[in-house]
A protein has these predicted regions:
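Structural register within alpha-helical repeat arrays
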Residues: 25, 45, 59, 66, ...
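Short coil turns that delineate tetratricopeptide repeat
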Residues: 50-51, 103, 153, 159, ...
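Residue at a conserved register position within TPR or TPR-like alpha-solenoid repeats
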Residues: 29, 63, 125, 132, ...
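Short coil/linker segments at helix-helix boundaries
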Residues: 62-135, 153-154, 313-353
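TPR alpha-solenoid repeat register
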Residues: 55, 108, 157-158, 164, ...
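Structural motif corresponding to the intra-repeat A-B loop/turn of tetratricopeptide repeats
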Residues: 32, 66, 85, 135, ...
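Start-of-domain marker
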Residues: 20-71
Length: 398
């Protein structure tokens, strides 16, 4: 028994001695930047010690040197191709393998430990991901962004890690993969809540598509909390917040956000505010917002269309009152409403503003439908063929 124990001990010592001598040779080559020679020694080390943490750690360091070696070569001559195209991925996997074999493995002097090594790879992976993304190689982009995110997390660089998850979400958007887009955005805001208003806007839209009102509300709440001290970024969320409060019929919060949005003076946002005010039946306030905005941009299509929409909605409200009177057999009241100047004014104004909008953009279906209906109600017949053709063409596209 003792004899066998001695044999095993001797075998362990000889293997350890071999691996250390071998690693010393690799280390010396790397220190003198003899990368191809270091690889030859490393191949021999790995063949004899495939389950040794120190060997895997040195292998990963060799891969890092290979990656840098290629960068230096191609910097001098851009026509060259990488000699070690998989070096950076091999380095990443090598560091992981070393840690899995021995979480306390230590590097030789001047070499990277497993965590430090992965941290060094973060920026290169990020650049590789962006290049792959710009070239339309979505699978590679996702892979490299994923590597970069994990590397940044090891460095406790939460902002950079969150940025990688956000970039992955963008890639998934181009792939129309909303489920994975949502997962990446959730990871991004979990790491850094104020990463970007765009993260919350896209998340809201993803949940809105799923008709998940609860999740939509949670996103709005998280966004308000994340940007509570940054009004400039919170402004970017106003349109989404207005959409949410309008969708759940919360006019109190809707009007509060509308007032803040109007105060920004942004023309597009003012046009949106007018629409929400119109939907909330705040017609006079909607008209004031649009009138103020039109003094700055009198030919703005959204503003002109918004004014037409405002009067059309008022007209429909009036006609709803008439219908209720008819249903209640209050025929005199129904007649009075139908003949009222209020109805005629709303109808005429809806037509005139939609007609102005039509002259700026004749291809908007919603505006064209209202314009045609008002022409019918006002008996401005026949309907122009061009208007009918444009409506029919857009309806066929739906």
């Amino acid at each position: 028994m003792k004899k066998w124990m001695l044999v095993l001990v001797a075998l362990f010592v000889s293997v350890s001695a071999f691996s250390q001598t071998c690693l010393d040779d690799v280390w010396q080559c790397l220190r003198s930047n003899q990368v191809p020679k270091a690889k030859k020694f490393m191949d021999a080390c790995m063949a004899e010690n495939p389950d040794n943490a120190s060997v895997w750690l040195m292998q990963a360091n060799v891969n890092v040197y290979q990656y840098r070696y290629d960068l230096e070569r191609m910097a001098k001559d851009p026509s060259l191709t990488p000699r070690y195209p998989n070096a950076i991925e091999d380095a990443y996997n090598g560091f992981l393998k070393a840690m899995s074999l021995d979480k306390n493995v230590t590097p030789k002097t001047g070499m990277f430990g497993p965590k430090e090594g992965q941290q060094v790879l973060a920026d290169p992976f990020k650049e590789m991901a962006k290049k792959a993304q710009s070239n339309g190689k979505t699978d590679d982009a996702l892979k490299y962004y994923g590597y970069a995110a994990k590397c940044y997390e090891l460095s406790a660089e939460k902002i950079n890690a969150a940025g990688m998850y956000f970039d992955m979400a963008v890639v998934y958007i181009t792939m129309n993969d909303k489920a994975n887009c949502t997962k990446m955005l959730e990871k991004s805001i979990a790491a850094v809540p104020d990463i970007s208003p765009l993260a919350y806007i896209q998340l809201y839209e993803n949940y809105e598509d799923l008709k998940d009102t609860v999740k939509c509300g949670e996103i709005i709440t998280k966004a308000q909390k994340a940007f509570a001290s940054n009004e400039k970024q919170l402004v970017e969320l106003y349109p989404t917040m207005m959409r949410y409060y309008s969708s759940i019929g919360d006019n109190e919060n809707l009007l509060a956000i509308v007032d803040k949005a109007i105060a920004t003076g942004d023309i597009n946002m003012m046009a949106d505010c007018a629409t929400y005010l119109t939907n909330a039946k705040a017609y006079d306030k909607a008209e004031k917002v649009l009138t103020d905005a039109l003094t700055k941009e009198p030919n703005n299509f959204k503003l002109l269309k918004g004014m037409g929409y405002r009067y059309a909605m008022e007209y429909y409200d009036i006609m709803d009152r008439r219908q209720k009177a008819m249903n209640s057999r209050q025929y005199e009241e129904a007649t009075r409403i139908f003949q009222s100047e209020e109805r005629k004014t709303a109808m005429q104004n809806a037509h005139d503003w939609c007609d102005k909008a039509y002259k700026v953009d004749s291809d908007n279906l919603e505006n064209n439908l209202i314009l045609r209906e008002m022409k019918v109600q006002l008996q401005l017949l026949p309907i122009p063929q061009e208007l009918n053709d444009k409506i029919n063409a857009r309806m066929q596209q739906k």
